[in-house]
Amino acid sequence: MTIRHLSETIINQIAAGEVIERPASVIKELVENAIDAGATRIEVVTAGGGKTLLRVTDNGSGIPADELALAVSRHCTSKLTDDVHDIRALGFRGEALPSIGSVSKLTLKSRPQDADSGFEVCVTGGHLDGPRPTALNRGTIVEVRDLFYATPARLKFMKTDRAEATAITDVVKRIGIAFPHIRFSLAGTDRTPFEMPATGTGAEATLERIGQVLGREFGENALAIDAERDGVRLAGFVGIPSFNRGNALHQFAYVNGRPVRDKQIFGALRGAYSDVIARDRHPVAVLFLTLDPALVDVNVHPAKADVRFRDPGLVRGLIVGAIKQALAQSGIRPATSGAEAMLQAFRAEGFGAQQSAPRPANSYSPASWRTAPPAPRSEWSPQTAHPAHRPLDLQAAPALRENGQAVLGDVAVPAADARASVAEAPVELMQKPLGVARAQIHENYIVAQTEDSLVIVDQHAAHERLVYEALKNALHARPIAGQMLLIPEIVDLPEEDAQRLAGHAETLARFGLGVEQFGPGAIAVRETPAMLGEMNVQQLIRDLADEIAEHDTADGLKAMLHHVAATMACHGSVRSGRRLKPEEMNALLRDMEATPGSGTCNHGRPTYIELKLTDIERLFGRR
């Protein structure tokens, strides 16, 4: 078969296969071009899920008439000169417009700010027509009709009009978060109109724009992030642990203003929340990374959704450290969604439906309380109510019973004891975040009162978090006890993996794992963490080698130790069904206030909810 040059149309269609996957890909490229042109208003109109019509209108700088033909030619751009590593624009490859024109009917109209009239060019299946004069306000309009008509096989892979329209909306929202000073609007026959008014610049404007996308509730449950390390700056907002979602669709990451889908960034985000939310839940976050363009490669893929950092360990450490610090400094704070859910449940059941119903035989009457027999009361004793009077009940794996308690059994963990001063005035306690304990219901929930709210605490979940944090602090305060192996276990690894693992030997030793290099391609394991008991040493070493190769950290071993501590905390905390004295309840509340992350238990569930007095008054029609 003879080797020959491909035609320009075929080349563009091949490029379109990489850049233009669906209608949303077209919108992404066109909106990014509008932003690069300095637009402050961008309007998007679609029809047929974008397969029939896509139109993007902006008020940017425009394109001169003599450059319109170049704009729809491959590898022609105004955003890049001779340094491919110094990329400061969203677009730079010069492939989007010619790729779109090769698989659709493209019309490009533009009028520069200083021009008296506009001009347009048309590209149909890769064939150029124009330029010619046209009536147009200042700015640019790009209209794409019959997408993929020139490559009908691609249409078979399109989803329904509704799904494609939703994908377009998601793309505009994702881009819009990073540019709050720009007004975005979406309209069309296949959608409900949507608009994001400009909010300005700065952190407050960004949070307001995020609220337009994620809803007002995010702002009420968000923590600000602002940290910098070695020339890399991280800013943005993350949700408190109890404000989480069932999927990762509410996670947004930007590198120098560019929306990215980078698994390393989202992996670091997951790691920062590793022990404060459940494994099947996902944090809500909007993160902005700003760094020298020379330190990141955005030219990994034509779609520019993936990036490659020169120092990935630095980026991961910055993200994990900054978020963990923000969570620790946030104090005790519940998600507003918990209280909202309770209020909605009250409103859904209501009281009106019950007013006309016949009264049950055992219902309340004014005199019934006088003749009702007293409710039976269970006997209380310090052994049943006071966790400090009993050892941790480690009903878990044998390794926990035999090794875990031996290693951490002497750790002083928070207990719901009577440390609170009985003489302390309730008024002073009511001024504290969790207030003063007023009652315990069903031997599981503590009802507390603050100056302007009612707080309900899950005593087991709350104390479980307190014990877990105490055990974690003990793990980090001193080296973990190791258990010597009678015969060292030899693990064969690739030579580079063995060298990397041996380089982390000192860190691993702090966690009770003694390793040393045994020849060019092997690791000798002489000691394992005592609290882990019997374990698959071969698998552990290989997993650690993979983690060090990818992230340059050995967090996997730390996570295993934390998991053991979490199990011990679960079995060593105040159990449900235990009656507590008022002093003990107040002591638990004070410990919660002093412990970072105590708003959620080890499994990610909330430890308490708070109902504002104003909301309670609304339930009773007082407001």
Curated annotation (Swiss-Prot):
Composition-biased stretches (Polar residues): 353-368
InterPro entries in the cross-refs: DNA_mismatch_repair_CS, DNA_mismatch_repair_MutL, DNA_mismatch_S5_2-like, HATPase_C_sf, MutL/Mlh/PMS, MutL/Mlh/Pms-like, MutL_C, MutL_C_dimsub
Pfam families, per the entry: DNA_mis_repair, HATPase_c_3, MutL_C
Sequence segments annotated as region (Disordered): 353-389
GO molecular function: ATP binding; ATP hydrolysis activity; ATP-dependent DNA damage sensor activity; mismatched DNA binding
Keywords in alphabetical order: DNA damage, DNA repair
GO CC annotations on file: mismatch repair complex
Keyword field contains DNA damage: yes
UniProt-listed GO biological process terms: mismatch repair
Role, per record: This protein is involved in the repair of mismatches in DNA. It is required for dam-dependent methyl-directed DNA mismatch repair. May act as a 'molecular matchmaker', a protein that promotes the formation of a stable complex between two or more DNA-binding proteins in an ATP-dependent manner without itself being part of a final effector complex.
NCBIfam families from the UniProt entry: mutl (TIGR00585), PRK00095.2-4 (NF000953)
Similarity annotation: Belongs to the DNA mismatch repair MutL/HexB family.
HAMAP family in the cross-refs: DNA_mis_repair
Name the record gives this protein: DNA mismatch repair protein MutL
Species per Swiss-Prot/TrEMBL record: Brucella suis (strain ATCC 23445 / NCTC 10510)
Gene: mutL
